[in-house]
Amino acid sequence: MTHPRDLVAGITVPYRIRFDECGPEGIVRTSALLRYAQDVAWIHSERLGFDRPWYAERGLAWVVRAAELGILAPVSLGATLSISTAITGFRKVWARRRTEARLEDGTLALWCHTDWVMTDHRGMPGRVPPEFPAAFAVVPGSFEPGRVPLPPTPSDAAVLVTRVRPQDVDPMGHVNNAAYLDYLEEALIAAGSAAQAAMAATPRRVRLEYVQAAAPSAVLDGVAWAERIDSDPAWAWRLADPADGRDVARGLVLPG
């Protein structure tokens, strides 16, 4: 039996790529990779004693505020990924996880950083309980939370009405963070062939910032356009609430 102290440095779990997780080319969707990352994070937390009842008893929950993925190699239907995860930093209300996925020959196919905020029973940010840095043996203050600042949306941006589907809502009653990746990719499909090529390229990076929660059944405005970030070509994405124009989420797809 694995002793809790052996879990401090992280865990590794195998995942077989399922038929329903792949697109027409037989390659796993980016959102499925992010779903693996959140699932293995839960497994790690549970094995250390921080399961859903533990959080419910204390009125606490983690909410993802930013994610960055590096997709280094295509992963095909039926492949098995060895997915490892570890906490790499804490700061006040924040925690960062790093997740890596390797093919059966050891090739690194994916890395992912997810930045989480601890929230209380009101849904407001609250300090990370002292149990966490102690359990994960991580020194606080060791990372800068991810942000995706974007310029105003240009007039020629592709526009796609985005509807939150019932299957996008997770057990916390939130739109799952991986669903936003589906929304991003749907907007890029609407933007045309160049955007679609960037979305399928390897290596590539995807950066997401979750600005505010989308409500279940919400109808939102998704827009995508070509952009340059530090002289590199990129595709930008914005999801906004049409009622007030405020951003719900922002994203970038960049060369690897």
Stretch-by-stretch model annotation:
Residues T2, L7-V13, G70-L150, Y210-V219, ...:
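HotDog/MaoC-like acyl-thioester-processing domains
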Residues T2-V64, T119-R205:
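Hot-dog-fold acyl-thioester-processing enzymes
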Residues P166-R250:
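Acidic/His-leaning functional-site neighborhoods
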